[in-house]
Amino acid sequence: MDFDMDLAKQKNNDNPVYYVQYAYTRMYNILHKEGTPEFTPVEHYDLLTDSKEIELTKQIAEFPKKVEEAAKHRAVNRICNYCYDLAKLFHSYYNSSRVNDPSNPQLTNQRLGLVEATMITMKNALDLIGVSAPEKM
C-alpha cells in the first residue's frame, strides 16, 4: 500500500479523510443551524420517497453487515470504504435536496431524521477506524 503524504495534508475533496469528515461536519451543522426545527422522532418515514433518500437509507441499513464482514475478514479497509461511500451518497443528497423546507414541516422532520441517522452511523464508523468526527472544519 502506498501512502501519499501530500494528499493526506490536503484540505479538499481529493483527500478521502477530509471528504468524509466534511460530510460529518455538514450533517452536524444542518442539525444545529439556527432556525432549523428540532427533529422529533416519528414512527414512519413515508415522505422520504426521493431516490437519493432511499439510497442513503439502504446504505445506513448496511452498516451492521459491513462491520461484521470487516471483523470476519480482518479488513478494516471495508469500514473506510463504507465511510467514503456513505459520505458520497450524503453529499449527493445534500446537493440535490432541500432538507429544511418551511412549507412542508413533516417532510423537513423526516429529512432531519435521515440526516441524524446518517450522522450517527458515520460517527460510529469513524470511531471504529480511529478517525475524528469534527463538528467544525
Predicted features and spans:
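Non-catalytic interaction-recognition regions
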Residues: 1-137
